[in-house]
Amino acid sequence: MKLKYLYSVAVATLLCLPAQAQLKLDGGETKAPYIIPSTDSAVVAYTGDYSTIHVASNCEYNIQHVANDWLTVRREKNGNISLFATYNYLVAARQDSLMLASSDGKYERKVYVTQSGNTMSGPLYADVKISGVSGVANQAQGGYDISKSLDGNVATFYHSPWGSTPTTFPVILTYNFNTAQHVDYAIYTPRQDGNNNGNWGQVLIEYRLEGSNEWITLKDTNFGMGSGAASISFGETGIDNVKSVRYTIKSGYADDGSNGFASCAEMGFYQINTVTANEMNTFFVDKLCTQLKPNVTRDMVVGMKNEVLKRLAYALLDGNYSTDYRVSEYRAYKPVGELLNELKTSYTYNNHENPTGITFEKGERVAVIVDGLENDGISLQVRNFGPSEYNTNWYALKNGINVLTIINKGNGYIDYYTSNFQHAPNVNVHFVLGKQNGYFDLTKGHTNNDFMELLANATGEDLDLVGQYAQCVFPVETLRANTADGRWTALQFDSITYYERQLMGLFKHNRDYGNRQAIITVPKSGGLYHANNDGCCIPFQALAQPTTSDPNYFDYWGMAHELGHVNQTAGVLWIGLTEVTNNIMSAYCEHKLKKNGFHRLENESQGFRYYNYLNNGIMKEAKLLPSVGGDVFVTLIPFYQLLTYTEGTGLQPDAYPDLYETMRTTNVPAIQRGNTSENYYGDGQRQIYFCKQWCDITQTDYTDFFIQTGFLKPVNEDIGDYDTRRLHITQDMIDECINYVKAKNYPTPPAGLVFIDTYNKNAFRDKVTVPANIAIGTGCIKSGSNIQIQHASWPNVVGFKTYDATGNLIHMTNYGHGYAGSNNHYEPTYTVCAWNSAESPARITAVSYDGSEVTCYQE
């Protein structure tokens, strides 16, 4: 034994010597080269620590190693080798190797390196899922029975009936244990396929004890029809002797206008592991485990059984543990389904509130500690917005420690949506040893310097830009390439959503609850900009304008257009208007935010759309359809003129806000998808309803304007507008509407209202007319078949009309038609009127706001 000990000491001493010292032991004799590493199978911890391989050699050697993304190899001056490994987020171990070769190439020695798999889940000390569970449902769609919620596969799910035999609420799902169990909590996982149908609303949860037929109420709660997995607590200490648990589902989500469905991807029941709970109480001061008790030493930590708590304890003892994003407080939000139903919008608001600034890797095992959760369930949403992948998964969270295996990589969000959002407490969450990516937040006063620092240190693919009203998620690589001023870019999205909410009356009528609107990135195959329940979706290849910091390049109209799709409200939307009434928002936001003075409707194509509206719409008595020149922007103009006259002039700035509120709070005529029946009037009734409500809200008789602009014209046509439905308005419906308004004895708006735009609106505000004493021909320049008329020569003009010798109206010309504006100089100084000899024009009149006319040119 003594000889073996002495030999070991000698070898150890040799290995600690540098190569030069070892050569002296050879007595100057020439020996065969040797390289002796202390191990040829090195093991590195998953935590990303470094390791040293001692090397004894009698020759110079080099290290041959193929570089990779997790292992760095360095030879030290004393001849030893240092191994530096990144953190291993995966359950599986990973291997590498390196070759030690003498300089003359005559001798080689291979060393294998293994990094341990991530053991942070602490498999022996995780919570226990109860087995031996069966289920019974009072109704189910064929092939979607309750067993699908117990098979451990979120891709399969229980679903209540649809089709010819619809769901009848309540839907009752009963889960029975083979033997009575202690239950601490349950986890309800909604379907994870991107379809919200069947997500739970109001649910009564009951349990039955062994040997009893009595059902005891646990809670009656609203899950908010959200997609996040939810933890259902059975009390602080759990409940013993439970034999059955029953869910009586009273409401659920449906996207087809039906009464709803019920579905469930997985239902699990759990018992809390007491070993982990005891270690949290023994070693840490607080429930979030952010501070060790004063008496805790490294020797004590060695004996901890929960691997993640042990690693955390070491990090806290080292004194360099960052909690910037790992430990945060999160608020509750109104469920997006409830908000949609209240606001009657077309799509839901942000479904990934509460960014954490933590990024996750696929297969990573993580620990999340929660404190402060009361009656409502929360979950961790991990979502990747590309460009490498686009996936989302949810993980239910409970108070205490939650050990999770992450399915897809992405950024983390705390899903905390509850009907009780106004009174629900904030919850505190600790992502133990989480990988910090950070997020930019206008509400925290972040500057562009903060933005640049976040980009420089980003660890994930995507970065969240958070404002008070909007939340953007863009690829880091795109922001690095395009965004010189992240604060400015984030502020533009926040301002767009602010002005849209202002126009919708959410501020005036106290319906802004803090829920943001989302702007996200989708795959290249996503086509063009579009909107859905995820918000404003921007394909990866189309990110240049939305992420720019150049005010002349930023796409105000396009972003407001897609966010406006989300905000399109029943009553301000019927067939033919899907790409129209959202642009009320675009025009409003463009006017408020675009600093170079450009206005799309007035300036694009030198005012051609207005000209088309007047000559092919008003003059030809067209119906209100996108078929006017095949241009939805032409159909937009009368809605825009109502906005300009009320809000733009400041005469009635609350008209549109009050209109939206009326549509939210009254019985708007219902529409039926795909209905092309001769007897279907739903969309036509909506159009009539809009006219009535506008007149009542403004206390003004707009019936003449609505007749001129085609709102009150008989129509009976099938219209294709993402759906095909019939727009059917009879003369009787029109007469009833006109009689309804006339009976109110409201005053009428100015007769020249069809000419109003943003450049001539002050004449309507100030009620000023064109002077009658200006000499005919003043400021008029003939050039070929056109007459250019200078506005300065005809003050207060709002438009022009051209007549032939017999007094027939040939043309209506909008203010500024033909004016070629330029950056910061878009307000027109002249109008170009057609003077085609083939039409025998005789004179042009300057039109005032009240419809009166003064001849300004004649031949």
Predicted regions: what is each one?
Residues 276-336, 645-769:
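Pan-zinc metallopeptidase signature
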Residues 34, 52-84:
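Surface-exposed binding patches on compact interaction domains or structured appendages
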Residues 279-440, 782-855:
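Beta-strand-enriched, solvent-exposed domains that form extended recognition/catalytic surfaces
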Residues 168-170, 178-187, 241-242, 360-366:
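Extended extracellular/luminal ectodomain segments enriched in beta-structured repeat modules
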Residues 92-104:
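A short beta-strand micro-motif common to beta-rich folds, especially ectodomain repeats
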Residues 169-170, 195-274:
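Trp- and acidic/polar-enriched beta-sheet ligand-binding modules for extracellular glycan
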Residues 451-454, 461-666, 690, 694:
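Catalytic cores of extracellular degradative/oxidative enzymes
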Residues 118-178, 191-198, 275, 800:
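Disordered, acidic Ser/Thr/Pro-rich linker "stalks" and the adjacent N-terminal cap
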